Amino acid sequence: MVLESFSASLRETIRKITGSSYIDKETVKEISKDLQRILLKADVNVKTVLQVTKEMERRALEEKPPAGMAHQDYMVRIIYEELLKILGEPSNVKLKPQTIMLVGLYGNGKTTTAGKLARFFAKKGLNSGLIAADVHRYAAYDQLKQIASEVNAKFYGDQSEKDPVRLIKHGLEQLKDVAVKIIDTSGRDSMDAELFDEIRRIKEAVAPDEVLMIIDATMGQQAGPEAKAFNDAIGVTGIIITKMDGTAKGGGALSAVAEIHVPIYFIGTGEHMDDLEVFDPKKFLSRLLGLGDLESLFETVQEADITEEEAQESFEKLMTGKFNLKDMYDVWEKFSKPGLMKKLVDALPLARIPGSQKIDDSKIQSAEDKLRMYRIIMDSMTFEELENPEIINAKRITRIARGAGVREEDVRMLLKEFKAMKNNMKMMKGNRGLKKMLQANFRSGNFGLEDLGIKE
């Protein structure tokens, strides 16, 4: 998960608040100190940390909760709103034909991000073309060409051309029928006049619709000065922060960049080409705090290619007890795509579920491995057995295990867990209040936030 330790600490603070019997001055001071420690550990600027916690304390002690809202929930709302202020404004990613110019220093993930952008726009129905305009790093051509093939994007490059302006103009002409043209420009090991002069020349000659700067999240609060230097020198329209999954300093990078008032368009959340996320401060913060993000939850389901009709049919089967192993197999197959289960877990409102614990990446990986094994086991079953698992006897368990290359205990565990799931669904079916609550929350699209008076 992005900012895993940061998120875990924030969620623990939320649980501490919601688990308190009352909120007094001592509790507010204690929560303030917790927040200061968490934010400083994430490399957020000291001045920013003090501003956030001072305002949080003032509001928690002076403001009265709206009618019908518990003081504990109102304090969570205050924390949400104060943290939101340091994350900047929502980006405005345009889903239309355009030319995008990527700039930034070496090692920040600029070339990889070019491929991720192409994959992102392809999902939105816009084909892309990648232009290799880094005329100084020899390996950049081959790297971008390989990435273009991986994401099924068109590619243009010319290793013999050393003038980036001529190269890009020719590339744009070659890719004129492509909706989104993405230019991977040269970087440097450090900011210098030569780099800025080259980027200015390209920008003036090409007039791109977007100039997006790529920044490494591991820089923490130092990302702010770097973004400011680029913006002052060439004028950037947006920021993409990479490697958010591999550092504890991502919070510092986000808050520092937000201070220069250049919108953050995307964040890189992993190594896969699909691991690029439009940055929406509200959704991002909601997940960090464990308040849930049903919009991302629905997007994940869409990414798994599950239609609304299929989802409704599966839900009805669950509620009526008609859900069988074949239905389970179909759902698991949809979610077998790398990274989907992780996205699903990140979107759940875990901090608002009593007794819930942090789900780290190792547990998610273990669950994915288990589901993969279960699918192999089900591949060794007959259609009749998938439709009616109750007919599977001890002799068949032995043959299924042998055919799947697993232990008999693994087959029994699958059948046991399936039976337990059906029993749980039967119990929920009889609880009208619980069923109504779940249906209402899923319709609202604000599970977790609505109870706090926070509107999307």
Swiss-Prot record:
Reactions catalysed, as given in the entry: GTP + H2O = GDP + phosphate + H(+)
Key word Cell membrane present: no
- Stretches assigned to coiled coil: none
Keyword Hydrolase found: yes
Enzyme superclass (EC) = hydrolase
The record's GO molecular-function terms, alphabetically, read: 7S RNA binding; GTP binding; GTPase activity
Entry binding sites for GTP: 104-111, 184-188, 242-245
Please give a single GO biological process term from the UniProt record: SRP-dependent cotranslational protein targeting to membrane
Q: How does it assemble?
A: Part of the signal recognition particle protein translocation system, which is composed of SRP and FtsY. Archaeal SRP consists of a 7S RNA molecule of 300 nucleotides and two protein subunits: SRP54 and SRP19.
Task: Quote the entry's note on domains.
Answer: Composed of three domains: the N-terminal N domain, which is responsible for interactions with the ribosome, the central G domain, which binds GTP, and the C-terminal M domain, which binds the RNA and the signal sequence of the RNC.
Q: What does this protein do?
A: Involved in targeting and insertion of nascent membrane proteins into the cytoplasmic membrane. Binds to the hydrophobic signal sequence of the ribosome-nascent chain (RNC) as it emerges from the ribosomes. The SRP-RNC complex is then targeted to the cytoplasmic membrane where it interacts with the SRP receptor FtsY.
What is the protein name for this chain? Signal recognition particle 54 kDa protein
Report the source organism: Thermoplasma acidophilum (strain ATCC 25905 / DSM 1728 / JCM 9062 / NBRC 15155 / AMRC-C165)
- The record's gene field reads srp54
